[in-house]
Amino acid sequence: MKNRIHNFNAGPAALPLPVLEEIQAELLDFKGSGMSIMEVSHRSKWFDDVINETVERINRLMGLGDDFQVLFMQGGASTQFALVPMNLLPEGQSADYVNTGTWSTKAIKEAQAMGKTVNVAASSEDRNFCYIPKDIPLDPNAAYVHITSNNTIKGTAYTDFPDAGNVPLIADMSSDILSRPIDASKFGLIYAGAQKNMGPAGVCVAIIRKDMLERVPASLPSMFKYTTFADKNSMYNTPPCFAIYTVGLVVKWIEETIGGLEKMEARNRKKADTLYSIFDSSDFYSGTADKDSRSLMNVTFRLPSEDLEKAFVAQALENGLGGLKGHRSVGGCRASIYNPTSQEGIEALVDFMKEFEKKNG
């Protein structure tokens, strides 16, 4: 489509063009209602169908059984950092956290601020979070083990999740949910802000194993309890209808157009391999993550100088390649290549990188 750039922003991020076109086509008249999806009542059959179909597609894509429930919440993953220990870490118990970067650090600090007992079981801070720890010593009596599955700022990700035995894993999957198949049975809770890989900002998807709901203290305020959302099909109060609707279109695209998570993973690996090959064959670009910890979603890299990095980002945008500036906390460059990013976009970026190196190397 004319005037559309290749969008490598970290979040809010690219959405599939067919999804945007479907939104555009029915924006003024949703399913013959004579109203926009932003105008229909969340108590109507129109929205009932939206939320129920979205849940069903997520269940199918992730292979979730009847022992899981999909919730749509607000406040992003940052709110989950507090809600997880509030709901799922009983008094007198501790939880293991693995620290792999900025978002893990925030989750740890939030749990500690709640007065909870937190054990940092492993950390990659010793090398500036450029790797994922292995052989993590976990407490078999912990209430849960919390991980951040993909680290957007440093460009690292788990290839295999920790073996926690009978202790439930809890994962912030904001930046890699639905990017590959996973064994959901290992998890007590998966949560993800939608704005990176599932849809627009405004909704956080929480996938909770139903037995975990038994831990929720009755004394918590209603809007802070997972049970409130589970009991009311995420409609205790007015939900973020437009965001949920868009998530529904994205999971429909993954299921019907891409063909499921195995095909999505193959697509994502091809994109990442194409981009990482530049670092492995060049002295001009250097990746910041260890090879065995590289993310398929966020490719972080440096150039020989900050001046060159600024020129790279500016000239890339002039060539229709946007969002390549690294996170403000670390600098450098970053290409976020979430599910919607096309192989065509990756090839365009690689061609630009080769040309930029030729002129400036």
Swiss-Prot record:
Keyword terms, alphabetized: Amino-acid biosynthesis, Aminotransferase, Cytoplasm, Pyridoxal phosphate, Pyridoxine biosynthesis, Serine biosynthesis, Transferase
GO biological process: one example: pyridoxine biosynthetic process
Top EC category: transferase
Gene name of the encoded protein: serC
Species for this entry: Desulfatibacillum aliphaticivorans
Positions with a binding annotation for L-glutamate: 43
Functional description taken from the UniProt entry: Catalyzes the reversible conversion of 3-phosphohydroxypyruvate to phosphoserine and of 3-hydroxy-2-oxo-4-phosphonooxybutanoate to phosphohydroxythreonine.
Catalysed transformations (reactions): O-phospho-L-serine + 2-oxoglutarate = 3-phosphooxypyruvate + L-glutamate; 4-(phosphooxy)-L-threonine + 2-oxoglutarate = (R)-3-hydroxy-2-oxo-4-phosphooxybutanoate + L-glutamate
The protein's name in its UniProt record: Phosphoserine aminotransferase
